Structure formats: structure tokens, C-alpha cells
Amino acid sequence: QRQMCIRDRTYTDKISRNGLRVGDILHNFEQKYAEAKARHEQILKGLNYEYDLTEIEKAWMEGIEYLKQFPLVDSEHEINNLLNDNKSVLCEGAQGTMLDIDFGSYPFVTSSNTICAGACTGLGVAPNKIGEVYGIFKAYCTRVGAGPFPTELFDKTGDQICTLGHEFGSVTGRKRRCGWIDLVALKYAIMVDGVTKLIMMKSDVLDSFETIKACVASVSY
């Protein structure tokens, strides 16, 4: 929960145009950092939140000094130059379509765009540079934390999927919510992502099940 609050606060700074950017470490960084720190301390004061930044701030400043040894570039130019030279660019993202800040199951979403178009807005890559879009999905559904989950299983079947699929959080070890595949959500993801090819994973998890169910329609109330 604490990690989520910190991440959300960082995105808030970005949208409010108050965030620190990598390029800032080369120009008046101390002043910009002090101003940002003062803003956040005012927020924490209003929440009556006790904190001690000494150790965290020390480690963070060491990280800033470490970054200074590397050349800084405008990533959008760097990536597009590589693409223009017919080079391959591997971009790493996280989280699925339904956690997208704009098109996911709001408000139970993350703070960024997780759909395919997020690669364009996040990297400065034009939409016409994207060719095939591979949609990767599990043979069943999982979810971490709160939010709608129409096919969630609360019985031993859900526990069995969780155990066989090793569905536990990679960081916290928290058990993931498990359920049957939601084809309505999958069809929606295909639409907003512009998927051209589908790849199903973890189908072997369901090998021992005599019956496999799927959600094929939903009703809004």
C-alpha cells in the first residue's frame, strides 16, 4: 500500500507539472529538489504523518550522483533514430489492459497507460511505427487487490488454480484472486489494444480440470 501511495504521488507531480525530471539533475537541481521536498512536507504535515527522510534522502542523493556519470539523451530521439535504422527496440512494460488509467476498470487501476498505445505516449513513438500487436493472456483470470472480478472463484477450484498456477505476488507473496477466463474482457482488450495476434499462456494449469468455464456475456445494472 505504501509503495502504491508513493507511485501515485509521483504521477500526481507529473500531471500537476511539479515533478522532477532526469534532466533536472544537471541544472539547479538542489533548488528544484528543495522546492519539491517542501511541497510534499506540507502535504504530510496536513495529514499528521510522521516521517524521517534522513536515510532515504541519503540513499537517493547517492543515486543521483551515480546517474551523473552517464550521458543523458532525449529518449524519443534515441528510439526513433534506432527505428529509422531498422534496429529492433525492446520496451518493457507492466500490468494488463484492465489496469489502464483511462480504459481499465476505473478507479481500480494503476496510474499510467498500460494498453498498447502507452508505448507511443510513454516513448515518443508514432502509432504508425507499430506493426503487429500481440495480445498475451492467461487461460484463466487473476487479479491483485480490489476491483471488479465477475468470474472470481471463492471455492477450492479457485484455490487449485492459484496453487497450480503459482499465483502469488512476486514482491509481497500475496495470494492472487483467481477465476475463469472472461471473454468479454478479453474482447474489450483486443479492441482497445488493436491486437492482431493472440497468445494464450498457462493453459497447462487447467489440464487436470474436467470442466473449464468461461464468461461469454455480461449484464450492466
Where are each of the predicted segments found?
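N-terminal leader/propeptide and maturation segments of large enzyme subunits in energy/redox metabolism
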Residues: 24-66
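A glycine- and small/hydrophobic-rich beta-loop-beta segment
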Residues: 120-221
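Acidic catalytic cores of enzymes that act on phosphate-bearing nucleotides/polynucleotides
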Residues: 61, 68-115, 123
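Flexible, glycine/charged-enriched surface loops at secondary-structure junctions
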Residues: 45-59, 70-76, 127-133, 144-152, ...
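Internal, well-ordered alpha/beta segment that forms a basic, Gly-enriched binding/recognition surface
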Residues: 7-14
